[in-house]
A protein has these predicted regions:
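Helix-to-loop junction immediately C-terminal to a conserved catalytic motif
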Residues: 77
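Conserved ABC ATPase "signature" region
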Residues: 92-93, 140-159
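ABC ATPase NBD coupling module
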Residues: 94-110, 134, 140-141, 277-281
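Short coil-to-helix segment of the ABC ATPase nucleotide-binding domain corresponding to the Q-loop/switch region
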Residues: 122-130
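Conserved ABC ATPase signature
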Residues: 163-167, 171
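Conserved catalytic motifs of ABC-family nucleotide-binding domains
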Residues: 184
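Catalytic Walker B motif of ABC-type/P-loop ATPase nucleotide-binding domains
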Residues: 188-191
């Protein structure tokens, strides 16, 4: 089953909230940092960080271990609070929100970790629909239809009744992506989702990320240490062809909404397209790429 942007079943997904913090008709960036700093004891991780991600855009976040990539994601989720500056998600400042209000903001964010724990006693379909089933306002049949649509989009429809223990590592990662996208979040955060997978399986995960970006128009941040996969995602796009989805090569001009951000010493050291990153004469960027790029 092919999943197109906002299928009819999505009308059953409850977007109403008792708090009404988020105005989805507004034009505010999906994510915005304004002069954000955070430190742990004497270790300053982020220094006066400022950037904005328009809705529907993608940022691929690179940097050496300890550069603050995962900290940045936790700030977006409100799991950490900045020492200074402002973090906004869909126009809402999350840095000082109480936990009850943060639940509304997080309800529009999907998160995929390197090791997403699945419920071993639940089937694939039950895992994917778990968060939807908790919404009392969503009919059971609508949950089933949404789960079927998501599994069809991700290419795992035939695995709906299997248990996680019956899946390969790559299939489990794809189930984690399906679970994250089931509630139709407008923002998806990927924290090293490809690490530990062999190159062929990793490419299937890359393709799912590309499909979500281009066909579902979600705003996404991809944190990865896998430079090959980062460039693959930045140089491919998903298109419909003869009723099926294809992931094809693309140049930077056709993907203006995709940019790299390289963190170094707590700051955004570089921001630009894949071509601009590869062409950068900056000594640190050259050294970083030399140490991390595979021998193509």
């Amino acid at each position: 089953m092919a999943l197109r942007r906002r299928p009819s079943v999505s009308d059953a997904v409850d977007r109403s909230t008792p708090l009404g913090l988020i105005d989805y008709s507004a034009t505010a960036p999906a994510v915005e940092f304004k002069n954000v700093s955070i430190a742990f004891d004497e270790n300053v991780v982020l220094r006066h960080l400022s950037f904005a991600i328009p809705r529907g855009d993608m940022r691929i976040l690179l940097g050496r271990s300890g550069s603050g990539k995962s900290v940045l994601l936790k700030l977006i989720l409100g799991l950490l609070r900045p020492d200074a500056g402002t973090v906004l998600v869909n126009g809402v400042e999350v840095g000082h929100l109480p936990e009850r209000d943060l639940l509304e903001v997080r309800g529009d964010i999907g998160m995929v970790f390197q090791e997403n724990a699945l419920f071993d006693s639940l089937t694939v379909a039950e895992n994917v629909g778990y968060r939807l089933s908790e919404q009392a306002t969503m009919p059971v049949e609508a949950v089933r239809e949404r789960v079927a649509a998501v599994l069809g989009f991700i290419g795992l429809a035939e695995y709906a009744d299997r248990l996680p223990s019956e899946l390969s590592g790559g299939q489990r990662r794809r189930v984690a992506i399906a679970r994250a996208m089931a509630p139709e979040p407008r923002i998806l955060l990927f924290d090293d989702p490809i690490t530990g997978l062999d190159p062929l399986i990793a490419t299937t995960i890359d393709n799912e990320i590309v499909k979500l970006r281009d066909l579902q128009q979600v705003t996404s941040i991809l944190v990865t240490h896998q430079i090959r996969d980062a460039f693959y995602v930045a140089t491919h796009r998903a298109v419909w062809h003869d009723g099926a989805v294809q992931v094809v090569s693309a140049d930077a001009a056709s993907l203006p909404h995709v940019e790299f951000m390289v963190l170094h010493e707590g700051r955004i050291y570089f921001q630009g397209s894949a071509a601009e990153l590869l062409a950068s004469p900056d000594p640190y960027i050259r050294e970083y790429l030399l140490l991390t790029l595979p021998p193509w």
